[in-house]
Amino acid sequence: MHNAPYGDTAHFGIPGGIHMLHRRRLAMLAAVPLLVGSALTACSGNDDAAAKKAPAGDPVAKFVRTAPGMAAPSAAELGPHEDEATGLTITPGVETLTVTGAKKSAAVALENSDGQVILTLLADDEGQAHFAYIPDKPLTVQSGEGDLPTIDGDVLFPGIYRVRFGGKTSADVRVLGVDEVAGDDFYAKQKLGDGFGYVTMRDGVTLSVDVSLPGPIEDGPYPTVVEYSGYSPSKPDEPQPGSMIAGLLGFATVGVNMRGTGCSGGVFEVFNPAQQADGYDAIEAIAAQSWVKGNKVGMVGLSYAGIAQLYVASTRPPHLAAIAPQSVIDDPWREQWPGGVYNGGFTKQWLEERTRQAEAGGQSWDGERIAKGDKTCGANQLIRSQNLDFGKFGKALVNFPPSAAARFLQLLVPRIEVPTFLTGGYQDEQTGGRFPYLFNKFDPDTFHRFKLYNGHHPDGYSPMLITDWYEFLSFYVAGEIPNIADGIRQASGSVFEENFGIDQNFGENRFADHLPDDFEGAKAAYDAESPVQVLVESGADTNPVGTTGERVRWDFD
């Protein structure tokens, strides 16, 4: 792929390269890692509307690829196409196109709107071929082996394509861009109840979900949060940590498995535009449910599920209320190539595990569901042979390719229009300490609360931060004054001690004076607090040593 030198951001529309913070903040925040180190040492469209456009002045508009001059996709353009001429099932998605129904090793050629063949794939054992990366020069390669060139080529851009197969040419199909969304009725007609189920994406792929309500469905609606990742958020009866805590505090929770993971269909890849678009679709479909309070949802999650929130929010789902990402990165490429040196440590291991778990039956619980008769889960495993080995793929990208701008969070977070609560530790042993590069990229007119601290990867769920997290979700998702009941505190002490080794609990109910109904007053007091808060010397408390919680807090505007 056409590569740019590491760190060259001028051609991405960032004048003078990447900047982090206003000068007034920069001098003090730059010193924080040194001080901490010493302490440790001692909107949705409709079928007729035009495609959703980026706002004027959007710095990433040219990297959110859409088919030029085309209206929003019609219902007929969405989902699988049973093509009469070729006899194939052709599924155009967001910067992807999947073909099924061919014979093993049969040649499946993709041609552009000019009638030129741009890539030929040999179908896998199941008669499948998946187009996502296109070489500069037409080639014929075996599908599903991840051996497409990674230096000379590009992604599959949105637009009109056709498939050639067996001497026949298919009808036109439309590959979508992230911002080319389905109509409101597509989301409104989907129904989800308490428990396990599936939600349908704009390309017809189904993602597995697990809904957990805090009470009977008829007693709703409930404030609702979504946790979206490639781990096991939709595994029945085993919620991820963010969902578990939110459920304890009275929220309805929905765990959603990314495409190509768990029981979800589709081809897995790491943070690609299709995955971002799926997040939009999932948010809109979930928010349309009758049991969702205000028909808006928030998002929660740490690490993988935290990073995913930033990508999803950048697609601007109209019914997303707020996000609370924790322990995040600023760019997948730089995570794999920090300082231009290949990361053979955690990132390599993490990508290898993602590849393994995205294999058919790779998470064990999906196999259990198939054995119990879940035919949708079983059918969704068939396409897994087309999954890309992203570890090998990314290792070949020694230089930053321009097409990777679609995953560069420093370019995407300016598009986020919802309130954001973001936390991270400078010594994060897994995702690293680059997350502050995101801070000044957020829209200054949108509410944000950033908390930085010295500490480890899971500390976002520690007592030091979890009460702040709950306060944010209460104000911006639930629309309620935060108030943690005594019963919840009594039940939580042992959980915190088990996970953090220290006898701690939730913080005080800071807005109790505003109960029961002075919501506006409580929220005004919360909003008036500093947007950037640095928690200094966490773990240095002598009662006992290691207790999470700062000795000093530095506030920045």
Model-derived regions, located:
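Alpha/beta-hydrolase-fold serine-hydrolase catalytic core, especially in secreted/extracellular enzymes
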Residues: 60, 116-117, 123-126, 135-138, ...
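Cap/lid segment of the alpha/beta-hydrolase catalytic domain
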Residues: 192, 197, 216-288
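Alpha/beta-hydrolase fold nucleophile elbow
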Residues: 291-303
